Amino acid sequence: STGHYYSDDKGNWYYKDANGENLKGAQTIDGQNVYFENNGRQVKGDFAEDGYYYDGNSGQRVTNSYVRRGASLWFYVDAEGRKLFGEQTINNQDVYFDQNYGTQVKGNFASNGYYYDEDSGARVDFGKNQFVKVDNNWYYVDNQGKIVKGAQTIDG
């Protein structure tokens, strides 16, 4: 059975099958894994309901890559195309992805207590058992290099 892609006046893409019906859900067309919403619109440049990210141009499922959603939200998808969560090592860099949403932590402390660079997202080594200044705020890092919170006795 053959079909064809077509677009609407808003630049959205669809695929009609041999019966003239719009495809829906996960599909493989010409060897490419693509996804169509319930209204038939192809998902491009975003995560679909199946949890995978689809390329903004080709619409093909993305694997083993950083992907961006909107202006500044970064994610990483694995060999299957699924979001990563928590502490990860990618390209020899220790990075962190939010446990709930999978967004990369940049320019902030993650829930694991480490700080991640605002540009690269790589974990910053502040040393151990010392005060550090980040964005005009002072923090204390413990013997593991993690930020401490709450009341603390330092050198006491």
Regions from the PLM with identified roles:
Residues 1-156:
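Extracellular adhesion/carbohydrate-binding repeat motifs centered on closely spaced tryptophans
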